[in-house]
């Protein structure tokens, strides 16, 4: 966003994502709970973040870890009570922390009363979901579910198919029905009245479906031929988001962030440009597909570094020019750990964790830190299918075996790509179960918890934790991190990512070595002679001679001049 935009509180903030199920258990059930979040608020305050985004804790059968909501108005007993939630909200506010809730309004659980009534053809709810008759005795279209298989499920009770873009127990809501929208807006207002500070909208750009319900013949090469061209950034999406903004948020100062699946930059500009009155910011995932050769996620592959830089640059420049606003991130509950993916989680654990943090926090947008990222948690490298819990992973494992993969090959792919990689318990200390629970954890604790944990990080002034703390402080003090124009530099370089944040009278220069070997980088055009170092991930500064900087493995520096 250009420098003359009206700054809101979230432009300077850093958001911390909590996946409550794996955060902290206070009851011995083996699953994290709301009291566990309350217990750790002081730790989060120490880190310096201002906003906590909580993934869903609503009543749910937990087929997709809470993204299948059966009751939007109540807290799932496994997390605690509404009183626990209100206490946590109150304690967070006392500490100056804001709470953003995750809400799923593209679909609900098939256990939801709305779905049950719709399936039974209750007149008020009959068209609350997307029901279709068979076509030629089979599914209405060839659209595929994001979790594998066809996206339509037959209901014996109703005698029709319903659409589920995700799990078979997650039925898509019919946004064409005005009463559905009214019910959803009413529900969001209920949580706002409790005092929450904003919402993260799950897969929000999928809510508008092309009402022709056509088969995907693969002719639109912009999209994977699985039907997504007919429901991604659909025909009425901007109309629906404008209505949501008008009916629920108005002129309030709330943070609204949309998760955008397979989106295009033109749409994200529109979604997040304040003049459009839709959302405050957007997540996009193109940079996290650079290890999907030919768009295929479920293969073992290295990441394409130059492509990663080009995608980040495209979004930085495009969103700035279009007055949009990025939510920037490496990690979330659906992605493997970035440290294992883009860094070196063994030989250069701390150096590469700090480097990735520096790169991200130097970009324009609101940075998001995912639990465990701030002290260097890694993928768990689970070597048996029995250790995996995620519905996507267990489904894909069977599909990979059917495709001819050996069990060992399938597990190696899951070790790299599974969503469970980021869902293991937060490693609080070196005691049993990493201090997460006194019971049996719902998913195994990674074996490296004795070396990598919060307690150890807090005791080491040079730890990854304090590097994150310094980056967050820097964001508050350096206006250029908010308003500076992004310019990339030597984008084809195969080892180094270098970019500037340019203001009227000053600029920041971020230079990062993405690999485990020392390398040289030509800085002649960057004129670093009079530049000062604001932050580095090595105690000893870099060597610069003959217009070249010598970068140590995973070295990352922010210069100011």
PLM features: residue spans?
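Active-site and adjacent substrate-binding regions of carbohydrate-active enzymes
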Residues: 1-561
């Amino acid at each position: 966003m250009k420098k003359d935009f009206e700054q809101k509180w979230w432009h300077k903030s850093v958001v911390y994502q909590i996946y409550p199920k794996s955060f902290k258990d206070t009851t011995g059930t083996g699953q994290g709970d709301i009291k566990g979040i309350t217990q750790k608020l002081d730790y989060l305050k120490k880190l310096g973040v201002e906003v906590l985004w909580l993934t869903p804790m609503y009543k749910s059968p937990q087929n997709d870890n809470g993204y299948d909501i059966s009751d939007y108005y109540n807290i799932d007993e496994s997390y605690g009570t509404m009183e626990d939630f209100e206490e946590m909200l109150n304690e967070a506010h006392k500490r100056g922390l804001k709470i953003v809730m995750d809400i799923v309004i593209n679909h609900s659980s098939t256990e939801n009363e709305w779905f049950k009534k719709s399936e039974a053809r209750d007149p008020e709810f009959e068209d609350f979901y997307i029901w279709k008759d068979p076509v030629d005795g089979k599914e209405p279209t060839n659209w595929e579910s994001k979790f594998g298989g066809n996206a339509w499920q037959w209901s014996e009770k109703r005698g029709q198919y319903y659409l589920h873009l995700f799990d078979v127990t997650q039925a898509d809501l019919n946004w064409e029905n005005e009463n559905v929208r009214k019910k959803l807006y009413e529900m969001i207002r209920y949580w706002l009245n409790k005092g929450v500070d904003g919402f993260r909208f799950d897969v929000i750009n999928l809510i508008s479906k092309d009402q022709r319900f056509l088969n995907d013949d693969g002719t639109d090469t912009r999209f994977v031929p699985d039907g997504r061209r007919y429901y991604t950034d659909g025909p009425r999406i901007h109309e629906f988001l404008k209505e949501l903004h008008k009916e629920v948020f108005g002129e309030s100062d709330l943070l609204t962030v949309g998760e955008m699946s397979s989106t295009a930059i033109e749409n994200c500009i529109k979604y997040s440009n304040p003049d459009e009155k839709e959302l405050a910011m957007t997540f996009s995932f193109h940079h996290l597909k650079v290890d999907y050769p030919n768009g295929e996620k479920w293969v073992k592959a290295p990441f394409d570094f130059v492509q990663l830089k080009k995608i980040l640059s495209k979004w930085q420049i495009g969103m700035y020019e279009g007055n949009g606003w990025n939510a920037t991130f490496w990690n979330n509950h659906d992605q493997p750990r970035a440290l294992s993916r883009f860094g070196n989680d063994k030989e250069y654990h701390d150096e590469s964790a700090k480097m990735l943090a520096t790169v991200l926090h130097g970009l324009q947008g609101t940075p998001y830190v995912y639990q465990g990222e701030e002290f260097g948690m890694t993928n768990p490298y689970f070597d048996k299918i029995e250790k995996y819990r995620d519905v996507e992973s267990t489904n894909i494992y069977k599909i990979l075996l059917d495709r001819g993969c050996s069990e060992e090959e399938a597990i190696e792919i899951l070790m790299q790509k599974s969503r469970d990689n980021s869902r293991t318990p937060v490693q609080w200390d070196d005691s049993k179960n990493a201090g997460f629970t006194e019971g049996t954890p719902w998913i195994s604790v990674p074996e490296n918890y004795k070396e990598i944990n919060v307690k150890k990080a807090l005791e080491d002034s040079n730890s990854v934790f304090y590097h994150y703390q310094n980056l967050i402080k820097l964001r508050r003090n350096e206006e250029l991190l908010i308003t500076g124009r992004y310019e990339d530099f030597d984008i084809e370089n195969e080892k180094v990512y270098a970019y500037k944040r340019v203001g009227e009278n000053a600029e920041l220069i971020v230079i990062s070595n993405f690999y485990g070997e020392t390398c040289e980088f030509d800085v002649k055009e960057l004129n670093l002679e009079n530049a000062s170092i604001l932050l580095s991930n090595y105690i000893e500064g870099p060597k610069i001679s003959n217009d070249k900087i010598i970068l140590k493995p995973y070295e990352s520096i922010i210069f100011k001049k």
